[in-house]
Amino acid sequence: MNIKMILLDLDGTLLRSDGSISDRTKQVLKSCQNRGIYVVIATARYWIGAERYIEEIQPDYEITTDGTLIHRHGEQIYSCSLDVETTNRIIQDLLTKNPETEITVATGRQVFWNSLHISESKKLHKAVYNDYSEPLSCHANKIVAELADYETAEQIAVRNHCRLQSYRGENWYAFLPEGAGKVQAIRELAKILEISLDDIAAFGDDINDMEMLEMCGTGVAVANAVPEVQAIADSITLSNDENGVAVWLAKNVLME
């Protein structure tokens, strides 16, 4: 096994249930980097929602915002976005369906949000308030809103020719540029670094990690992953609360 890059989903995979990363996991990741292996986070979170963990583990690259952005130490090197017209049309469609719906719009590392409780949010306390009463002048990498059902979200996605992403057990839906996602971002990064997909180990737990695990040479599911992810994984490690990522890397990459 010649692993040259490690791809890490955050929530439910690298992070424990309390949102922390164990010292053992941080130690193992640093040992991998010391051997010349790229450590990359690949998360649906916005950059500002992942910033705390970026500072903690100092990955070589950050794939965030459902694969629409790649940063290297905070510097953007790749972006896939909706045009300004589509961005504003989606926002208006969402507000037409429900004038009270909460909407977040990511543009690069900045996030707009029409919530009055931004300061109370653990993930998005650095978001900028916007009530969307005036059109935005930016390209959105990702728009997320809470909607009553999937059918409503699908109608908006079809009308605006964008990709729809849903999340396990939640009524939040993401609207992404057509063709965007973790898989496309990984392909772009592998091309930049001239690394074969066969030499990448990817770790995940949820439905939106499946393509990533299937595409890479080694797909690893944590024990708490949904059944669909475990079914397609090449290997299953311990759960996120049992240092599953670190245990697998120590055994199969560091040979400890």
What are these regions (language model features)?
Residues 1-3, 16, 22, 176-178, ...:
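Mg2+-dependent phosphoryl-transfer enzymes with acidic/Ser/Thr/Gly-rich catalytic loops
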Residues 7-8:
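Walker B beta-strand of ABC/ABC-like P-loop ATPase nucleotide-binding domains
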Residues 17-119:
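Active-site phosphate-binding/coordination module
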Residues 32, 43, 66, 143, ...:
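Residue-level signal for inorganic ion chemistry
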Residues 57-58, 66, 159-162, 215-216, ...:
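Short, structured coil segments at secondary-structure junctions
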Residues 59-67, 80, 123, 165-167, ...:
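Short hydrophobic/aromatic-enriched beta-strand-loop microsegments
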Residues 93, 97-212, 224:
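Conserved acidic, metal-coordinating active-site core of Asp-based
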